[in-house]
């Protein structure tokens, strides 16, 4: 591929302040091209101060020592390795770039000198939303990236029930994106802590099984509906609450997605509630 001459690279750095005069939409268009192109991590690694003109939030990550045995890289280098490890999809690479943006704000060191970043997914999601709004990113891209950032540090679902609930919450596309992000995030950690790859493989296999079986993970797929609930005397919020309880039981494997079984369970739960 092409490389930038040293004198050109110096000129880019010297002139970076001029980016402040360019329309946010134009910068966003170029950022999308960068993120989905070849070697985005290498470009970002070389020019963080240039990107920092319109996204100054990234600068505290550069050289930030995580002081944690799970991490052999500073926050910025960890981030770049995660970016390089996800497929070239705008939402995924954005999420990889911004998933730890809030870590410097959340850093705390314990008595043993170990670093912790409690609450960093929520802080990173908040900051990512602000940053993407600043460049007037498309709503669908912004919301997908922010959701992935918010979810990126949650435990990988290890059971059929866990994957079913995640599928219900995120949908297939974003759950697959989340697993890809978690895979990249784990690969960017210290080598001794990369065993999560097998858990991700297992979650993906369960997801494939659920989709192949057309497993019930939504109210639309449930064998009973709101009319069935009103026919047995439920009304108002109680209808939705009962349907949600039945759906959860089906996803957990406690009930089959069978109309008669669900109606029997609903009647039993209604009677139990009356007796309380």
Predicted regions and their residues:
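Generic anion/oxyanion-binding catalytic loop in active/binding sites
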Residues: 16, 71, 113, 218, ...
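Glycine-rich, flexible loop/turn motifs
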Residues: 15-18, 54-60, 215-220
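Internal alpha/beta core interface subdomains
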Residues: 1-20
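Charged substrate- and nucleic-acid-binding regions of tRNA-handling and nucleotidyl-transfer enzymes
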Residues: 1, 130-134, 189-276
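Short linear loop/turn motifs
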Residues: 11, 57-66, 145-147, 237-249
């Amino acid at each position: 591929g092409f490389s930038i001459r040293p004198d050109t690279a110096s000129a880019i750095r010297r002139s970076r302040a001029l980016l402040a005069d360019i329309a946010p939409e134009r910068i966003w268009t170029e950022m999308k091209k960068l993120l989905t192109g070849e070697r985005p991590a290498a470009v970002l690694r070389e020019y963080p101060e240039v990107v920092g003109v319109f996204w100054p939030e990234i600068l505290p990550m550069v050289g930030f020592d995580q002081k944690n045995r799970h991490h052999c890289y500073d926050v910025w280098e960890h981030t770049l390795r995660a970016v390089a490890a996800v497929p070239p999809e705008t939402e995924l690479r954005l999420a990889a770039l911004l998933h730890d943006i809030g870590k410097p704000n959340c850093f705390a060191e314990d008595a043993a000198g170990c670093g912790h970043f409690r609450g960093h997914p929520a802080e990173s999601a908040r900051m990512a939303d602000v940053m993407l709004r600043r460049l007037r990113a498309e709503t669908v891209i912004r919301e997908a990236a922010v959701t992935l950032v918010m979810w990126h540090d949650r435990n990988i679902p290890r059971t059929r029930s866990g994957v079913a609930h995640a599928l219900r919450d995120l949908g297939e596309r974003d759950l697959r994106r989340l697993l890809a992000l978690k895979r990249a995030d784990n690969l960017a950690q210290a080598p001794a802590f990369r065993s999560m790859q097998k858990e991700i493989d297992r979650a993906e296999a369960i997801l494939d099984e659920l989709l192949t079986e057309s497993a019930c993970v939504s109210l639309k797929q449930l064998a009973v509906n709101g009319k069935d609930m009103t026919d047995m005397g439920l009304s108002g919020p109680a209808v939705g609450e009962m349907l949600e309880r039945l759906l959860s039981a089906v996803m957990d494997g406690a009930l089959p997605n069978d109309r008669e079984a669900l109606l029997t369970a609903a009647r039993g739960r209604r009677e139990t509630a009356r007796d309380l």
